[in-house]
Amino acid sequence: MSGKTFLVMAGGTGGHVYPALASALALREQGANVVWLGARGGMEERIIGRTDIPMRLITIGGLRGKGVAALLMAPVNLVRALWQAFSVFRKEKPDCVLGMGGFASGPGGIVACLTGTPLVIHEQNAIAGMTNRWLARGARYVLEAFPQTFAQAQSVVTVGNPVRDELAALPSPQERGIGARKPTLLILGGSRGALALNEAAPKAIAALPETLRPRVVHQAGEGKDQTCRELYASLGVEAEVYDFLQDMASVYANADLALCRAGALTLAELCTVGLGALLAPYPHAVDDHQTANARHLEQAGAAKIFQQDNLTVERLAETLTSLLGQPQKLLDMANAARTLAKPEATREVVKYCWEACAND
């Protein structure tokens, strides 16, 4: 299998970049040459720039919410991006292209179709993004994290979302002691933080009876940790507040319940480790895909959903009181989450990339 070159396209958010990076590293472990195609100025430029994966950048951005001038320039910008992507293809000569979302995936996927290069796409969310909806028609394989995301497409396989191997290696919820120890509430606002969670969570925890208050580990987001820490202190609540949590395997291993947004990568991690959650979908996500993501966990009994408009201190405190007072319920939710896990997702993505080459 060695000697093949794979062009991995992903960017824009961690939900696209990190699953793609896991797949890229797995491909390299199997002897492949990997090149990354990203958008200039995107977060992928910083994240992949810290690795030794060669990166090629094109100039492309989104149109949602932009003004008239941006819409008028869109055809010109698309042609430029297509030409830049074509130049990358001509130089790198990829044997297969893996598109995992983000702005660069559009031009790169189009060039793959035009040049006859096998294309594999992967959609992380329960509602497919615009780029992947377009590219599904020309893809050799369409991979989805959630069932029925591409109900009408051909060659669709539900594989889950790639996550880090160390998370899949964690013991089961029961072996970790969920339901049999003082609970730890893990609050994740994402790397940039979620203001609604940072404000509501401390007040809700303060409203709990002293005997039910959990240990609190709170990721408040870059530049938001000090304000959040001061709020907890003013309410008389002990909490470990961080801007960003690094060793997530250890963090998850010691958590009994999560309070977080409903991004695809976060939910994949919750299911992989087996951790119940209170989910507050980001209300401005494109096509409200976070709510769709969250529904899968809710239907399995692994989560409860709080829409932004009903994320009140009173309702959150009431739910926390109910769950923290029923240790068995925490264990049941954690076990339900783990039934949704797809620990082989990375290997499945890589397998279909190799198959796309073999069938060329």
UniProtKB/Swiss-Prot annotation:
- Biological source species: Hahella chejuensis (strain KCTC 2396)
User: NCBIfam families per the record?
Assistant: murG
| Domain of life the protein comes from | Bacteria
* GO biological process entries: carbohydrate metabolic process; cell division; cell wall organization; lipid glycosylation; peptidoglycan biosynthetic process; regulation of cell shape
Give the UniProt entry's GO cellular component terms: plasma membrane
* Transmembrane segment boundaries: none
Residue ranges of coiled coil: none
Give the way it sits in the membrane.
Peripheral membrane protein
Gene3D superfamilies listed in its UniProt record: Glycogen Phosphorylase B
Family of this protein: Belongs to the glycosyltransferase 28 family. MurG subfamily.
State where it is primarily located.
membrane
Q: What is this protein called?
A: UDP-N-acetylglucosamine--N-acetylmuramyl-(pentapeptide) pyrophosphoryl-undecaprenol N-acetylglucosamine transferase
- Report the locations given in the UniProt record: Cell inner membrane
Main role?
Answer: Cell wall formation. Catalyzes the transfer of a GlcNAc subunit on undecaprenyl-pyrophosphoryl-MurNAc-pentapeptide (lipid intermediate I) to form undecaprenyl-pyrophosphoryl-MurNAc-(pentapeptide)GlcNAc (lipid intermediate II).
One GO MF term on file is: undecaprenyldiphospho-muramoylpentapeptide beta-N-acetylglucosaminyltransferase activity
Please name the top-level EC class of this enzyme: transferase
Record bears the keyword Cell membrane: yes
Q: In which pathway does it act?
A: Cell wall biogenesis; peptidoglycan biosynthesis
Q: Which UniProt keywords apply?
A: Cell cycle, Cell division, Cell inner membrane, Cell membrane, Cell shape, Cell wall biogenesis/degradation, Glycosyltransferase, Membrane, Peptidoglycan synthesis, Transferase
**Enzyme nomenclature, EC number:** 2.4.1.227
Listed binding positions for UDP-N-acetyl-alpha-D-glucosamine are T13, G14, G15, N125, R164, S191, Q290
Q: Which reactions fall under this protein's catalytic activity?
A: di-trans,octa-cis-undecaprenyl diphospho-N-acetyl-alpha-D-muramoyl-L-alanyl-D-glutamyl-meso-2,6-diaminopimeloyl-D-alanyl-D-alanine + UDP-N-acetyl-alpha-D-glucosamine = di-trans,octa-cis-undecaprenyl diphospho-[N-acetyl-alpha-D-glucosaminyl-(1->4)]-N-acetyl-alpha-D-muramoyl-L-alanyl-D-glutamyl-meso-2,6-diaminopimeloyl-D-alanyl-D-alanine + UDP + H(+)
